[in-house]
Amino acid sequence: MKFSKVSLLAASASVALSAPVAVTVTQHVHQAATVVVQGIVRVENGQTLTTFITKGTQTASASPVATTSAPIVVANAQVDSIATSVIQESAVVAESATFEESSTETSEAFSTATATIQAVQTSASATQDDVTTTLTSSTQPTSTTTPTTTTTSPTTTTSPTTTASPTTTASPTTATTTQSTASSTQSSSSDFSTSMVNEHNTKRALHKDTGSLTWSDTLATYAQNYADSYDCSGNLVHSGGPYGENLALGYGTTGSVDAWYNEITSYDYSNPGFSESAGHFTQVVWKGTSEVGCGLKSCGGEWGDYIICSYKAAGNVIGEFADNVMPLA
């Protein structure tokens, strides 16, 4: 084993007065056996003595070392560097002048340790390769394709959802169509109710002390049910219900209100009372009426739209015309 004389002399000088001996055991793990090299550095009679003792059975074939050797550590830092160089360098012990002066025990220990250290150093390069290979091999599970396969599985699993989509899509489509139709119907109904109540209030506003009407869904439902039952024959027959009522055919929506109101020309304010020729007009402007609701049926062709409006409270009450049919403002 080759040592630097300068290093050895420096170590010898520095540890001459060193405190108690520090012992480090370096263990080399092989596949078939374990060899333990024990290095002891001590100061005796002013001389620095180093003893190496091999424990365990030495294996002839150099097997890959699983772990790297730890350096021999002693109390003095300079001796530590010497011990490290002993592990790292391989040569004949006799070449070291310093160790020639050591005791026979030391020389024998070096001779015994040399073969062991050479075997360890011979396998050092293989150890590094094996360690690298082992690390690479142990790292492989991290990059294994199993997670990728697992990740792909959910994608495949979602396929039934995609397959089910047409059914789900068809349902919203139907729902959307239904909603659109309902929305359109509601919008049309809203437009109809707004236009009808506004047209009534426009006419009522022309008369003194005559308030506006409000739309009643209850009256509108009653009127619409009766309109739906109309046979579009051209004959107009009153429903006979509890509300005041005006009917029209072929005038359109607001056109019906206009036609009813135009009967004002037949009303005699000087002789207030009911008249067949002015009955629709008096119901439209009846002061005591506060609610209105109308129904519509399209007969098409010759007759056009059938309109029915129901009123609450009912107008045309005998004996109350003077108080409820107010003159123009």
Curated annotation (Swiss-Prot):
Post-translational modification: O-glycosylated.
Location of the protein in the cell: Secreted
Family matches, as InterPro entries: Allrgn_V5/Tpx1_CS, CAP_dom, CAP_sf, CRISP-related
GO cellular component terms, semicolon-separated: endoplasmic reticulum; extracellular region; extracellular space; fungal-type vacuole
GO biological process entries: fatty acid transport; sexual reproduction; sterol transport
Gene Ontology terms for molecular function: sterol binding
Note on domains (UniProt): The SCP domain is necessary and sufficient for lipid export and sterol-binding.
Protein name listed in UniProt: Protein PRY2
Organism: Saccharomyces cerevisiae (strain ATCC 204508 / S288c) (Baker's yeast)
